[in-house]
Protein backbone atom coordinates (compact mmCIF):
# COMPACT_ATOMS: atom_id res chain seq x y z
CA UNK A 1 0.00 0.00 0.00
CA UNK A 2 1.28 3.48 -0.87
CA UNK A 3 1.26 6.28 1.67
CA UNK A 4 1.06 10.04 1.18
CA UNK A 5 2.44 12.83 3.38
CA UNK A 6 -0.17 15.52 4.01
CA UNK A 7 0.86 18.88 5.48
CA UNK A 8 -1.71 20.94 7.39
CA UNK A 9 -0.59 24.58 7.44
CA UNK A 10 -1.52 26.45 10.60
CA UNK A 11 -1.08 29.88 12.12
CA UNK A 12 -1.44 31.30 15.60
CA UNK A 13 -4.06 33.98 16.19
CA UNK A 14 -5.77 35.74 19.07
CA UNK A 15 -9.33 34.56 19.66
CA UNK A 16 -12.31 36.67 20.68
CA UNK A 17 -11.67 35.74 24.31
CA UNK A 18 -8.05 36.97 24.08
CA UNK A 19 -6.52 33.51 24.13
CA UNK A 20 -3.98 32.39 21.56
CA UNK A 21 -5.35 29.72 19.25
CA UNK A 22 -3.98 27.64 16.41
CA UNK A 23 -5.97 27.88 13.18
CA UNK A 24 -5.68 25.53 10.20
CA UNK A 25 -5.33 27.67 7.07
CA UNK A 26 -4.58 25.19 4.26
CA UNK A 27 -3.64 21.63 3.32
CA UNK A 28 -0.91 20.71 0.85
CA UNK A 29 1.01 17.69 -0.37
CA UNK A 30 4.11 19.82 -1.05
CA UNK A 31 6.75 19.83 1.70
CA UNK A 32 8.43 22.91 0.22
CA UNK A 33 5.18 24.88 0.36
CA UNK A 34 4.77 23.85 4.00
CA UNK A 35 8.31 24.93 4.86
CA UNK A 36 7.86 28.23 3.00
CA UNK A 37 4.69 28.88 5.01
CA UNK A 38 6.57 28.15 8.26
CA UNK A 39 9.45 30.44 7.26
CA UNK A 40 7.12 33.42 6.66
CA UNK A 41 6.82 34.10 10.40
CA UNK A 42 7.20 32.62 13.86
CA UNK A 43 3.40 32.38 14.16
CA UNK A 44 3.24 29.90 11.26
CA UNK A 45 3.81 26.18 11.35
CA UNK A 46 2.57 22.89 9.96
CA UNK A 47 1.64 19.41 11.07
CA UNK A 48 2.50 16.32 9.03
CA UNK A 49 0.26 13.29 8.66
CA UNK A 50 0.89 10.07 6.76
CA UNK A 51 -2.27 8.67 5.21
CA UNK A 52 -2.88 5.61 3.02
CA UNK A 53 -2.88 6.45 -0.68
CA UNK A 54 -6.29 4.82 -1.09
CA UNK A 55 -7.95 6.59 1.87
CA UNK A 56 -10.95 7.59 -0.24
CA UNK A 57 -11.60 4.13 -1.70
CA UNK A 58 -14.50 2.10 -0.39
CA UNK A 59 -13.41 -0.80 1.80
Where are these regions (language model features)?
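Short amphipathic alpha-helices within nucleic acid-binding modules
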Residues: 34-38
Amino acid sequence: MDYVHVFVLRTLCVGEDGEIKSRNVAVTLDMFEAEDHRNNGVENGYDTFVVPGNWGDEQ
